[in-house]
Amino acid sequence: MIWLELAIIQRALIGCVLTGFLTGLIGVFVVRMRLSSIGYSMSHGAFAGAALGVAISSNPLLTSFLFSAVTALLIGPVADKARLSQDTITSIAFPLNMSLAFIFLTLSPQVGLSSEVASVLWGSVISMSNKDILFMAILCTATPTLIGFFWKELFAIMFDRRLAEADGINTRPFVYFIIFLIGIVITLSLKLVGGLLIFALLFNTASTVLQFLQEMRKIIIVSPIVGAITCVSGLITSLAFDIPVGSCIVLVSTLIFAMSVLLSPKRKRREVKEPN
């Protein structure tokens, strides 16, 4: 196919593989540690930051990272210090970030739904730069290394946080670490998938793999692979039908998840156990 020879498409293809790898990996922790509401708030925090970057004609990646960091602080250490539940903080942070995002986009000097504004909302094939690819490649190397280094503690927390604490593990630093990691992954994936859709990719891939596998080590290995395949499939669909890449990636991931639920061995076992 001719479009595969274009440098823009090649960057997008590499970006899809790296994005799918990262979201598939971090998504396991989001699902298993029950951080779905936190991931949702983090994604919209990054979205608000990117919108601010567009409004002030600054680097959306930088402002997105700053907003993600602030949101992570509010959800993690600040919530604990104030003795507020994470659900309370995320319930406040989500509408606040969405409100700020649309205010910033309204104040944007660009006319109408420009390409930069559209990429913040829905993602864009042409928005990936060599610098973005480099950052994602570094994160793809650093993240599995850090997870492997702290695997014993993280596995215990994923299994049961209270039991991990009873076993003498200080769980808070590790939960904060995962929250900040979620923010970084979302920030770097924002250009490709878009701020309104990135959370679906975090949740769908891991949930799909969990329909078939139970051993955590296998899940950690398979989920990034499924994520990469999903993103590449979404990119190809986007190019074939000329529709936003982020929407296609999320649509493909949702269809794969729906199929996994129908074909899941867990579902079949439940049907066998149910009395007639």
Across the structure, where does each feature detected by a protein language model lie?
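Transmembrane helix-bundle core of multi-pass membrane transporters
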Residues: 9-11, 90-148
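Cytosolic-side transmembrane-helix boundaries in multi-pass membrane proteins
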Residues: 243-276
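Small-residue-rich segments of transmembrane alpha-helices in multi-pass membrane proteins
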Residues: 45-55, 93-105, 123, 127, ...
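Helix-loop-helix "hairpin" substructures at the membrane interface of multi-pass membrane proteins
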Residues: 129-205
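Transmembrane alpha-helical segments in multi-pass inner-membrane proteins
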Residues: 191-247
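Membrane-interfacial amphipathic/re-entrant helices at transmembrane-helix boundaries
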Residues: 1-21, 271-275
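Short loop segments and helix-boundary regions at transmembrane helix junctions
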Residues: 28-111, 209-221, 238-241, 265
